[in-house]
């Protein structure tokens, strides 16, 4: 078990830069116990037993806030429920996205025949909303294939929301580079999705907190 890239810490909260490939919380099985929560508890033994208030997919990198105290956990959880926490992501999408900006609204749910994939279902699915803006088209990799750099602002927090909104034909129709579930990524490829801004109200001081951390791609 390794350490953490700590962006900010005080007596109430900690903000970390989660690397791609690391779980946010423990999963089932001995091989899924190394995660952000486990590392926080190892470094700070006096913190809550369950400090997590939100998650990033294992394949997604970026900013994650956790609570050290029960009061901070309760306050941050309420902020997430009321959608008072604002997050923005940057991603590289396969190919050239023709439009410059827009809003995606799609309903989806677990695909029981192909977990952990989600599938589009406007009847039984939960609706997710994402605002997006094209940053630029750029060459990527050794072959210099064209990809589109996109900023995402999810207004809801559904599982795989940005990945499905990117890949599905009713969304952008361009999977995120490196996506093994919804795109053409291989088992060794990195998902090019990074949570680069995080805004919330400090649970103890009431101060507006804003963190920005650019991706490494």
What are these regions (language model features)?
Residues 1-217:
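RNA pseudouridine synthases
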């Amino acid at each position: 078990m390794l350490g953490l890239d700590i962006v900010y810490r005080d007596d109430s909260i900690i903000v970390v830069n989660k690397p791609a490939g690391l779980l946010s919380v423990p999963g089932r099985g001995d091989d899924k116990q190394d995660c952000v929560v486990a590392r926080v508890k190892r470094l700070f033994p006096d913190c809550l037993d369950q400090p997590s208030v939100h998650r990033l997919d294992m394949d997604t990198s970026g900013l994650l806030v956790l609570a050290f105290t029960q009061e901070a956990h309760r306050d941050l959880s309420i902020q997430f429920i009321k959608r008072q926490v604002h997050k923005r992501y940057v991603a590289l999408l396969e190919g050239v996205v023709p439009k410059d900006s827009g809003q995606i609204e799609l309903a989806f749910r677990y695909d029981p025949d192909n977990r952990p994939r989600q599938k589009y279902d406007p009847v039984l699915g939960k609706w997710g909303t994402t605002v997006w803006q094209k940053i630029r088209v750029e060459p990527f990799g050794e072959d210099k294939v064209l990809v589109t750099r996109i900023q995402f602002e999810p207004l809801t927090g559904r599982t795989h929301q940005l990945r499905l909104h990117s890949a599905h034909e009713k969304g952008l129709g361009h999977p995120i580079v490196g996506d093994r579930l919804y795109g053409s990524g291989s088992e060794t490829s990195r998902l090019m999705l990074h949570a680069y801004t995080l805004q919330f109200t400090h649970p103890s001081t009431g101060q507006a907190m804003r963190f920005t951390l650019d991706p490494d791609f």
